Amino acid sequence: MINHDEWLIVGLITSPQGINGKIKVKSLSDFEERFTKPGIRWIQKETESPKKLQLISGFQKPGKESFVITFKEIKNRNEAEKLKGYKLLVKVDEIPKLNKNEFHLTELMNLKVKILENNKLKIIGKVVNLENEKNNLLVIKLLTNDKEVLVPFVKEIIPEIDIKNKFLIITPPPGLLEL
């Protein structure tokens, strides 16, 4: 299990790319150098400890939020295939400092989701995933029925985020939370 106090998930390994061990990674980061600048990187499968790998190179796929990267240790497609589903991590103490009202998207994971109802804040669920291939969407698991809903990550719908106290407030338009 990933310890979110020590590690920040910055990408998801989705598939091999070609036959020479290149890997396609879905970015969860605004910092492209995490996928392009050579150096040490960490990967982890949910049930394992993080593994250290040496990033040799990487480039962004045109018009996409995904990158194709090359690790020194991964020599062929079969080895790359075994990494499908792994998460690309950075140590929390290596995260660039952000301005006051900025945060990393992955910091939204596991935040409680609140809604204003009868002038009181009510917890309705929690953030369980992020979808950002085309648009940033939060995957919220509702407490009432255990269903997951996609909520666009826009100021009009999510006017307040409190990372320190681990919650966000949503003002969904009618029907957004209904399945």
UniProtKB/Swiss-Prot annotation:
Full protein name: Ribosome maturation factor RimM
GO molecular function: ribosome binding
Description of how the protein assembles with itself and partners: Binds ribosomal protein uS19.
PRC barrel domain: residues covered: 100-176
Functional note: An accessory protein needed during the final step in the assembly of 30S ribosomal subunit, possibly for assembly of the head region. Essential for efficient processing of 16S rRNA. May be needed both before and after RbfA during the maturation of 16S rRNA. It has affinity for free ribosomal 30S subunits but not for 70S ribosomes.
Species of origin: Prochlorococcus marinus (strain MIT 9515)
GO BP annotations listed: ribosomal small subunit biogenesis; rRNA processing
Localization of this protein: Cytoplasm
Gene name, Swiss-Prot/TrEMBL: rimM
Keywords: Chaperone, Cytoplasm, Ribosome biogenesis, rRNA processing
